[in-house]
């Protein structure tokens, strides 16, 4: 593993010494705070997300879950009570309120495709249940019994009926086409909205018929933000485009493309979009990794290679494609490993500043500055585009310029920008309140040309008046 201190050398972020007078846009940047308890989410909103301009935060499923130790128990509901090892209903409500007060919307991870996979048990908050019997919520007739495979589990992803009516990994599959099930799901989601939630990530949306989700979402208040988890699979019948009418989509193809940085290659987003690998930008949630891809080996991660992961995140924030989602979580050595917990099994506070097993991307200075750069330039046209296998560069109107070097060797060359002539400074060396540049200054000529020495695996972002 590369030393995380290399990030300060690898990511060179620059800004004009003169102030920026451009009209500011509202940030579109979000973050997944995976397994942060409610108190920690509120703290991060107040101390880092709000001040940095992060627009929304995705939090882990808030409902009561199976009472076991692994992280994935949160994705096995046993009731719709807002009570989990991440915190109580009152703590959840307080968290949402505190985040909203500093301009951060809360998106809740909604597990509505299924309930648990356990034969029976008692949930975290004391609710007794059986696999197909959840008192006051669901009975056996509220679940699919597909009869299409052994044990009613999905074995053929090319078969739409199996994907959407059989059991995912043995989890009891709700009959989301029935009126009773839809009403109870809507009641749960409306309960969360009453606590201030702005929208939902629909977990395992691929396993719910698009028409079922249309009916559920239509019953929610207008303006509820929706993002679907639908992984594209070659040769599969169910495809992400079916879900575009009801919300945005997590674009897993973007995450896979970001692994190009691992082989010293800058992803060509324009080419990938033209070849049909991506959904339209306005509907895409772009990300480098999430809680699943972090564990299945299909993405860059903050633990496996922090320098490359951070470089890809900077690239994501600089690009025009999608609505970017950052990622923060905890370190682990085993797939099933839960976050740090207390004596009663409750998830402990995430103390980012102490580096006690938590990866807190939202507190990195380069990420904070890149959010600001994106917010100021996001509505400007992209010009002066250059792309080779190892580097890319582009301008954003007459205000911004970005260049990135994915190679493990230095790149020295001139770039054409649309920036005004001026002196620019390495903002990674700033703590936020310096009046002068503490590092090397960069000159942009009268013709807009800048000579840059891009360090190995580094990025440069310039901002003008």
Indicate residue ranges for each PLM-predicted region.
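Boundary/entry segment of secreted carbohydrate-active catalytic domains
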Residues: 23-40, 168-173, 177-178
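Active-site-proximal helices and loops of the catalytic beta/alpha 8
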Residues: 26-31, 44-50, 54-55, 61-77, ...
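Aromatic- and acidic-residue-enriched carbohydrate-binding clefts of CAZyme catalytic domains
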Residues: 28, 65-97, 133-175
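Active-site cleft segment of glycoside hydrolase catalytic domains centered on the general acid/base Glu
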Residues: 166-179, 209-217, 221
């Amino acid at each position: 593993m590369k030393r995380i201190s290399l990030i300060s050398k690898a990511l060179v972020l620059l800004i004009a010494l003169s102030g920026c007078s451009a009209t500011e846009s509202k940030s579109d940047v979000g973050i997944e705070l995976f397994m942060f308890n409610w108190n920690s989410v509120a703290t991060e909103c107040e101390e880092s997300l709000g001040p940095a301009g992060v627009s929304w935060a995705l939090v882990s499923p808030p409902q009561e879950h199976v009472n076991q130790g692994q992280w994935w128990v949160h994705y096995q509901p046993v009731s719709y009570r807002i009570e989990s090892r991440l915190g109580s209903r009152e703590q959840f409500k307080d968290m949402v309120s505190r985040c909203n007060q500093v301009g951060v919307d809360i998106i809740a991870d909604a597990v509505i495709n299924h309930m648990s996979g356990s034969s029976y048990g008692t949930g975290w908050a004391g609710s007794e249940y059986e696999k197909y019997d959840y008192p006051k919520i669901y009975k056996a007739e509220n679940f699919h019994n597909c009869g299409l495979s052994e044990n009613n589990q999905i074995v053929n992803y090319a078969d739409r009926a199996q994907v959407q009516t059989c059991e995912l990994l043995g989890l009891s599959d709700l009959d989301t086409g029935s009126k009773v099930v839809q009403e109870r799901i809507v009641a749960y989601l409306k309960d969360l909205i009453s606590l201030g939630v702005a929208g939902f990530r629909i977990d395992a949306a691929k396993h719910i018929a698009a028409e079922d989700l249309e009916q559920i979402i239509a019953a929610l208040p207008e303006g509820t933000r929706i993002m679907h988890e639908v992984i594209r699979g070659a040769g599969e019948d169910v495809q992400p485009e079916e879900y575009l009418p009801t919300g945005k989509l997590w674009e897993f193809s973007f995450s896979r493309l970001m692994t190009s940085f691992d082989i010293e290659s800058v992803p060509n987003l324009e080419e990938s979009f033209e070849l049909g690998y991506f959904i339209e930008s306005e509907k895409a949630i772009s990300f480098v990794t999430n809680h699943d891809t972090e564990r299945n080996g299909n993405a860059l991660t903050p633990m496996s290679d922090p320098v490359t992961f951070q470089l890809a995140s900077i690239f994501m924030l600089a690009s025009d494609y999608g609505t970017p989602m950052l990622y923060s979580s905890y370190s682990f050595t085993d797939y099933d490993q839960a976050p740090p917990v207390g004596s009663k099994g409750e998830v402990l506070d995430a103390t980012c500043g102490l580096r006690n097993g938590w990866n807190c991307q939202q507190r990195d200075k380069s990420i904070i500055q890149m959010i600001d750069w994106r917010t100021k330039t996001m509505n400007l046209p992209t010009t002066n585009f250059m792309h080779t296998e190892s580097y890319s560069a582009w301008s954003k109107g007459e205000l911004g310029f970005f260049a990135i070097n994915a190679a493990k060797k230095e790149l020295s060359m001139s770039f054409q920008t649309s920036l005004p002539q001026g002196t620019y400074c390495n903002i990674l060396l700033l703590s936020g309140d310096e009046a002068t540049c503490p590092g090397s200054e960069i000159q942009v000529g009268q013709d807009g040309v800048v000579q840059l020495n891009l360090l190995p695996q580094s990025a440069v972002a310039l901002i003008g008046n």
